[in-house]
Curated annotation (Swiss-Prot):
It is found in: Cell inner membrane. It comes from Escherichia coli (strain K12). Required for the activity of the bacterial periplasmic transport system of putrescine and spermidine. This is Spermidine/putrescine transport system permease protein PotB. SUPFAM superfamilies: MetI-like. The gene is potB.
Length: 275
């Protein structure tokens, strides 16, 4: 069994990543895509202000989408965890149902809904709230909406798991000692649910930087993410070495985020043990 698992990991994880790393140090060739000539130019190109700006823009968009998911997801997860046990499975089922549909199809549906002639603008015009359609599509806001729409369930699930495990007697003790609802939330609930918050933020932020089809469909050419750069290099420009170098750089950034999560989790566990 162990040999099978190790073989599967080597064949489908280790070797493909090794090929990408190797390709990132090679030279582009118009005929065969890759020339077996070692170079570091692919990584030095990433220091160009254009690509560095795209990377920072991707981090910024991913951070905003993560914060939006946290603000929207925490109250929903709290509401879900406080419902009767008989009702929770139904709402959890409704939360998971969208995963049965391809996310690309869902983004197309959202694009139709938010377009100038879409249902949202038509409804606002009918109410008399606006006189002319609001331009939402092909803006940074549209990309954020698309990312939140796709990734919100990834925030809700770990938050729900953490909130459900809250020690109720501890909350009751805080009330008995005169703590207000705000004090209880800040000093007890948030620290106890911090593992879920960190896990949810990672589950949202890591894929948010690479969902190129969201920025393609919702943001247009002026709102590119680093995932779009990788896609263009592999599929359009056919510069596989530079695309591989960009992929490795993105992987390193994600790895650093995972390292921060691991360190934060260890510190939280030590703090809980001391208390």
């Amino acid at each position: 069994m162990i040999v099978t698992i190790v073989g599967w990991l080597v064949l489908f994880v280790f070797l493909p990543n090794l090929m990408i790393i190797g390709t990132s140090f090679l030279t582009r060739d118009d005929a065969s895509f890759v020339k077996m000539v070692f170079t570091l130019d692919n990584y030095t190109r990433l220091l160009d202000p254009l690509y560095f700006e795209v990377l920072l823009h991707s981090l910024n968009m991913a951070l905003i989408a993560t914060l939006a998911c946290l603000v929207l997801g925490y109250p929903f997860a709290w509401f879900l965890a406080k419902l009767p046990h008989k009702v929770r499975p139904l709402l959890l089922f409704l939360l998971i149902v969208p995963f049965w549909t391809n996310s690309l199809i869902r983004i197309y549906g959202l694009k139709i809904f938010l377009s100038t002639k879409g249902y949202l603008n038509e409804f606002l015009l009918w109410l008399g709230v606006i006189d002319t359609p609001i331009r939402i599509m092909f803006t940074p806001s549209a990309v954020i909406i698309g990312l939140v729409y796709i990734l919100l369930p990834f925030m809700v699930m770990p938050l729900y798991s953490s909130i459900e495990k809250l020690d109720k007697p501890l909350l009751e003790a805080a009330r008995d000692l005169g703590a207000s609802k705000l004090q209880t939330f800040i000093r007890i609930i948030i620290p106890l649910t911090m593992p879920g918050i960190i896990a949810g933020c990672l589950l949202v932020m890591l894929p948010a930087m690479g969902l190129f089809y969201v920025s393609d469909l919702m943001g247009g050419a002026k709102n590119l993410l680093i995932g779009n750069v990788i896609k263009v290099q592999f599929l359009n420009i056919r510069d596989w070495p530079f695309g591989a170098a960009t992929s490795i750089t993105l992987t390193i950034v994600m790895g650093l985020m995972l390292l921060v999560y691991w360190r934060a989790s260890r510190l939280l566990n030590k703090k809980v043990e001391l208390e």
